[in-house]
Every structure is written in structure tokens, then in C-alpha cells.
Amino acid sequence: MSFLKKSLFLVLFLGLVSFSICEEEKRETEEEENEDEMNEESEEKRESPERPPGFTPFRVD
């Protein structure tokens, strides 16, 4: 009986550890994706500065 308790405890403990590691990796992946999205948005803003409607930088006569 004692052997079964120890085995069950070990299995549950290892399962909990592996679950927490998976959750941590998932959280890191989501943070990286959010950082990538923020970088893409900031690059788009830098590439296209805000201009009033109808404004063209070159004048054609």
C-alpha cells in the first residue's frame, strides 16, 4: 500500500512539473508573438508618417 501511495505521489508530482513547464513555454511564446505584433505596428507607423488627406509630397505641374 505504501508503495502505491509513493508511486501515485511521484506520478502526480511529475505531471504537475511537466504541466507547469508547458504553461511557462506557452506564456513565453505568447509574449514573443505580442512583441512581434508591436514591432510590426511601430514599423508601419515609421514607414508611413501621418499626413493630412490629399497631401502629396511631390508637386506635379
Curated annotation (Swiss-Prot):
Residues 23-50 form a propeptide. It is found in: Secreted. The keyword Ligase does not apply. Residues 30-42 have a biased composition (Acidic residues). It comes from the Eukaryota. Belongs to the frog skin active peptide (FSAP) family. Bradykinin-related peptide subfamily. This is [Thr6, Val10, Asp11]-phyllokinin. It comes from Agalychnis spurrelli (Gliding leaf frog).
